[in-house]
């Protein structure tokens, strides 16, 4: 007779085993109708799964925007599979998981799907969902599951069973009328919950993410609890498409990618201007916060990577080469090189903390299918730093890092930042005492600055706890950029020591610190955040001076030269075009300030100033405009509204 404890503390006793749906029905038909699944003792279960012992139960309903929505999306992936098998009986189904804001299904199909095909598939999904059929779950033996998929010719499902499921397990088979899929669940009890969805696009994806395997077709979709939420999301996707950094990068002549160098960025003059300004800004912050800048080698002997432990964990992601019977790896990260610099010369406790920063050129062999413009690349530059300190200095150094993180993000207009603190995992190095001290130091550093944070129990690295900083952009998308990671392992592995107060040899604590993460990725984020309307200090072109007739050509040239001598990225546009045409063209190029010179301006020694957003700032004396724009640049004002 299980006793079920509900979230409000009330209890209900049942004579026999009971399901989440049974409990919901005992409370009321309205709740039962809204019930998607349950959370029994913290574990998600299907609404039909039986509870045989005393347990706590949370009923997951359509009001649940996290678990409830994720379950709906997962069930929509199965609905997609159902529709696909009706329309393309020869398709072989691979996997159909949920992802952020949606779901996908990988399928093996000879014919290439088009956008028109997606519309046809979506229409079939809607027709099926409209019937609100029941989803039937059956727990079967491993052999029964394999026989079911073998009878249907589902070779990918058979491979999953063979390689990923124990023979002793009882897999869950979900029956969508004649269609069967396999999943650990939970899923919706019926299709009434899957009414507000759409298919987005189709892309290629290697089976199991391995380029040695067959290329499958991946169909992406999304789903929500109601029509309005779906419409709002699609509106955000439309806006995101307009802001796509690849599209704007081409429009503003910032960079390009090409097949001969997958995942490597070709920076054009305009894009490299943004990159360099970003470096200058970070260098100023490094000086302000007491860092020394270093530069480590791009490539080091395999022996060093083995000593650091990276070879065991990252070998597949490292580019390697050999010379004179020695094997080398191009660095995927900067930390081992920084320890080598620390190890040169005897260090005393008086030398600590030692803050070492580098714009490190790193390379990682990312799967080709994962590459995405400059957001996900193989060659990138990290604004990486490592702090060597004593245990007693941890809190002060972490506080200093956090201040630098927030100071930096504020300059770019990011003020919505989520912070997570990851604590000790079961498998770890270092004593409980140092973990206690370190975790408390990270908490105190955050709390001393009144920063709200979420604790992720057991999610820290084996070598130390960490803080993660996630930015939310204007579209509400999350970008994990900054990290502050303690490391009790690497300094010890690579022989880093310092002389303590009592003349003993001690191993320093190492703090890994990144703010932007990858400069390439961060520039991509900025392009999409600003929609290409960079603040004046970052804009590749900061001002353009235009004449109305040939009569003002010399005056325009004179102004352009003056601005350039004052450190302003300005150019003259003397083309024999109508002034309206020139203004439209430079507006599309997102040039912050457009200076127009006609006869009146030339005679008065002035310029008419307008912004790329169409605001008329009136007429300026040339020197006054120079002071105005120099202030915009020096103060790094956002001036996004202008």
Swiss-Prot record:
Its cofactor is Zn(2+). Its EC number is 6.1.1.3. Catalyzes the attachment of threonine to tRNA(Thr) in a two-step reaction: L-threonine is first activated by ATP to form Thr-AMP and then transferred to the acceptor end of tRNA(Thr). Also edits incorrectly charged L-seryl-tRNA(Thr). Binds 1 zinc ion per subunit. One of its GO terms (biological process) is threonyl-tRNA aminoacylation. Belongs to the class-II aminoacyl-tRNA synthetase family. It is an enzyme of class 6 (ligase). Homodimer. PANTHER family: THREONINE--TRNA LIGASE, CHLOROPLASTIC_MITOCHONDRIAL 2, THREONINE-TRNA LIGASE. Pfam families: HGTP_anticodon, TGS, tRNA-synt_2b, tRNA_SAD. Zn(2+) binds at residues 335, 386, 512. Keywords: Aminoacyl-tRNA synthetase, ATP-binding, Cytoplasm, Ligase, Metal-binding, Nucleotide-binding, Protein biosynthesis, RNA-binding, tRNA-binding, Zinc. GO terms for molecular function: ATP binding; metal ion binding; threonine-tRNA ligase activity; tRNA binding. It is found in: Cytoplasm. This is Threonine--tRNA ligase. Gene3D superfamilies: 3.10.20.30, 3.30.54.20, Anticodon-binding domain, Bira Bifunctional Protein, Domain 2, Threonyl-trna Synthetase, Chain A, domain 2.
């Amino acid at each position: 007779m299980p006793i079920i404890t509900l979230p409000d503390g009330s209890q209900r006793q049942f004579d026999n085993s009971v399901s989440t749906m049974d409990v919901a029905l005992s409370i009321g038909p309205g709740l039962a109708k809204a019930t998607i699944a349950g959370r029994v003792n913290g574990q998600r279960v299907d609404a039909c799964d039986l509870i045989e012992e005393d347990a706590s139960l949370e009923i997951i309903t359509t009001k649940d925007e996290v678990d409830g929505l994720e379950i709906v999306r997962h069930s929509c992936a199965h609905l997609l599979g159902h529709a696909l098998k009706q329309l393309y009986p020869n398709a072989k189904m691979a996997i159909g998981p949920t992802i952020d804001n949606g779901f996908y299904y990988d399928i093996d199909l000879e014919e290439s799907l088009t956008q028109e095909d997606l519309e046809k598939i979506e229409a079939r999904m809607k027709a099926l969902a409209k019937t609100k059929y029941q989803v039937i779950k059956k727990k079967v033996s491993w052999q029964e599951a394999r026989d079911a998929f073998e009878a249907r010719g589902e070779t990918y499902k058979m491979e999953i069973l063979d390689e990923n499921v124990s023979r002793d397990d009882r897999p869950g088979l979900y029956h969508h009328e004649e269609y069967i899929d396999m999943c650990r669940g939970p899923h919706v009890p019926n299709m009434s919950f899957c009414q507000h969805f759409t298919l987005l696009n189709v892309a290629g994806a290697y089976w199991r993410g391995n380029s040695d395997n067959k290329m499958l077709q991946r169909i992406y979709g999304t789903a929500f609890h109601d029509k309005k939420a779906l419409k709002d999301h699609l509106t955000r996707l439309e806006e995101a498409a307009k802001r796509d950094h690849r599209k704007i990068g081409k429009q503003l002549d910032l960079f390009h990618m090409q097949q001969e160098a997958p995942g490597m960025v070709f920076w054009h003059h305009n894009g490299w201007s943004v990159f360099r300004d970003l470096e200058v800004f970070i260098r100023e912050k490094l000086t302000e916060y007491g860092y020394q800048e270093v530069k480590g080698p791009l490539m080091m002997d395999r022996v060093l990577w083995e000593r650091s432990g990276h070879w065991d964990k990252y070998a597949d992601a490292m580019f390697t080469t050999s010379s004179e019977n020695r094997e080398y790896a191009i660095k995927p990260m900067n930390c081992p090189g920084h320890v080598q610099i620390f190890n040169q010369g005897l260090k005393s406790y008086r030398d600590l903390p030692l803050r070492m920063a580098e714009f490190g050129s790193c390379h990682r062999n990312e799967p080709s299918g994962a590459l995405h413009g400059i957001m996900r690349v193989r060659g990138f530059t990290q604004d990486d730093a490592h702090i060597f300190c004593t245990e007693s200095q941890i809190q002060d150094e972490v506080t200093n890092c956090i201040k630098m993180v927030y100071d930096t993000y504020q300059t770019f207009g990011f003020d919505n930042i989520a912070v997570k603190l990851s604590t000790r995992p079961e498998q770890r190095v270092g004593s409980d005492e140092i973990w206690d001290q370190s975790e408390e130091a990270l908490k105190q550093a955050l709390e001393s600055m009144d920063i709200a944070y979420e604790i992720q129990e057991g999610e820290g690295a084996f070598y130390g706890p960490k803080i993660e900083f996630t930015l939310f952009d204007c579209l509400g998308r999350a970008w994990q950029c900054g990290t502050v990671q303690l490391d009790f392992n690497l300094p010890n592995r690579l022989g880093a020591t310092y002389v303590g107060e009592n003349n003993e040899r001690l191993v320093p604590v190492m703090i890994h610190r990144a703010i932007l993460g990858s400069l390439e990725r961060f520039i991509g984020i900025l392009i999409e955040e600003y929609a290409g309307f960079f603040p004046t200090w970052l804009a590749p072109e900061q001002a353009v001076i235009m004449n109305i007739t040939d009569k003002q050509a010399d005056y325009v040239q004179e102004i352009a030269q003056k601005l350039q001598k004052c450190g302003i990225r300005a150019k003259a546009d003397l083309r024999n075009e109508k002034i309206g045409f020139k203004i439209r063209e430079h507006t599309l190029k997102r040039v912050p300030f457009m200076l127009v010179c006609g006869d009146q301006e030339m005679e008065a020694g002035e310029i008419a100033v307008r912004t790329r957003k169409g605001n008329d700032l009136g007429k300026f004396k040339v020197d006054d405009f120079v002071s105005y724009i120099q202030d915009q640049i020096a103060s790094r004002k956002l001036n996004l509204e202008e």
